[in-house]
């Protein structure tokens, strides 16, 4: 097998608690042709010193220190822009995650054997359970259309692209634009997959190759509290859905997801005791996405949710428990320095116009 260069990146803010474990996991790779860029986002907890110590020990490691604090997705995109011009693959590892020793070797092996593959995933250990079990062994290469359709059409919970630490990207995809993660939402890594799998295949290695640490300090608590993920998924469905679904399928999925979004808001309106920030956020996002929030939609969603709960109480409780138990948060927390807030979900990549009437 050829040994193409892999550029590994770790964007980090105040990651001193686990950064050494992360870096050591890269150093222990059985695949040796890599370089490693750590982008320190104005950390205040010793992160910089840890990274610089390792950079002095191994010349494949370099540390880039931001002059100003960036929001979390912007820092990821800066890291992607810093990959080597000679690299063929790009591997991200979050600062509180780590890689198993064969991670780079197994992923490169699949990529080299299948030139059509642009993104490569694998099983991942998330705390005490294995994630991303929805692919069917022994098939290793899936068309981008096949994978994205399955997700947009409501694939089972165990099916998905993976988290940033569990994926490897072909470097040519990363270099296609200024921002590899195409929007500032907590779902941006998934958006990147939807975007780039329009013209490439998805590969999957049936081996646990990475570990994702999930704990209170790493969850993007503000995004979790506001539930930014519903609007981010609806954004992806509007923007990328037409590439993978026919008109009827797209209309059905848009209707289903908007109704689900409205039910979520209805429940919070009557029992959630949400503050003004919550309502301002969702009103603005729905307006941007072409589905203006209105009281009639809220009342309809409330009535539907109530009827479902009365007629099928077991189902309602089960759905609620499933949603609470299996929510996945995409990005690691990056608290803002005093006086500086991270950016919201303003659509930077393109302005979305209202969907056609037949899709509402």
Question: PLM features: what roles do these ranges have?
Answer:
Residues 102-135:
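Conserved donor NDP-sugar-binding/catalytic core segment of glycosyltransferases
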Residues 25, 32, 40-49, 68, ...:
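A conserved acidic beta->alpha catalytic loop
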Residues 141-233:
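Conserved nucleotide-sugar donor-binding catalytic segment
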Residues 268-360:
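Membrane-interface aromatic/basic loop that binds lipid-linked glycans or pyrophosphate carriers
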Residues 3-6, 27-38, 46, 59-62:
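Short loop->beta transition adjacent to catalytic acidic/histidine clusters or analogous donor-positioning motifs
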Residues 14-28, 34:
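Short, well-formed alpha-helical segments that are part of the catalytic scaffolds
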Residues 86-96:
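Short beta-strand-to-loop acidic/aromatic patch adjacent to the donor-nucleotide binding site
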Residues 66-85:
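Glycine-rich, basic loop-to-helix element that forms the pyrophosphate-binding segment
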């Amino acid at each position: 097998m050829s040994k193409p260069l892999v550029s590994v990146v770790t964007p980090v803010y105040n990651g001193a608690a686990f950064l050494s474990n992360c870096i050591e996991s890269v150093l222990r790779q059985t695949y040796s042709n890599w370089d490693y860029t750590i982008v320190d986002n104005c950390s205040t907890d010793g992160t910089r010193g840890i990274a610089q110590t390792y950079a002095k020990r191994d010349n494949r490691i370099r540390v880039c220190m931001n002059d100003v604090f960036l929001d979390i997705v912007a820092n990821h995109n800066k890291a992607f822009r810093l990959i080597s011009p000679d690299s063929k693959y790009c591997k991200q590892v979050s600062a509180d995650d780590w890689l198993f020793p064969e991670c780079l070797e197994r992923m490169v092996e699949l990529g080299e054997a299948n030139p059509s593959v642009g993104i490569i995933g694998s099983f991942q250990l998330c705390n005490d359970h294995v994630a991303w079990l929805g692919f069917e062994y022994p098939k290793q290469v899936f068309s981008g259309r096949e994978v994205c359709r399955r997700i947009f059409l409501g694939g089972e919970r165990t099916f998905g692209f993976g988290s940033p630490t569990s994926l490897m990207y072909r470097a040519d995809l990363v270099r296609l634009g200024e921002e590899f993660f195409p929007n500032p939402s907590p779902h941006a890594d998934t958006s990147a997959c939807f975007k780039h799998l329009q013209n490439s295949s998805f590969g999957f290695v049936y081996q646990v190759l990475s570990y994702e640490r999930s704990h209170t300090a790493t969850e993007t608590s503000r995004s979790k509290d506001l539930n930014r993920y519903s609007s981010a998924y609806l954004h992806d469905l509007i923007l990328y859905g037409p590439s993978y679904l026919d008109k009827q399928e797209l209309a059905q999925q848009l209707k289903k997801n908007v109704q689900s979004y409205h039910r979520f808001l209805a429940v919070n309106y009557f029992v959630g005791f949400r503050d003004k920030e919550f309502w301002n956020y969702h009103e603005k996002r729905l307006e941007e996405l072409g589905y203006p929030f209105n009281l009639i939609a809220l009342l309809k969603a409330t009535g539907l949710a109530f009827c479902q709960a009365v007629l099928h109480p077991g189902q309602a409780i089960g759905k609620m428990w499933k949603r609470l138990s299996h929510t996945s948060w995409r990005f690691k927390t990056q608290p803002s320095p005093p006086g500086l807030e991270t950016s919201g979900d303003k659509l930077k990549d393109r302005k979305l116009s209202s969907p056609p009437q037949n899709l509402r």
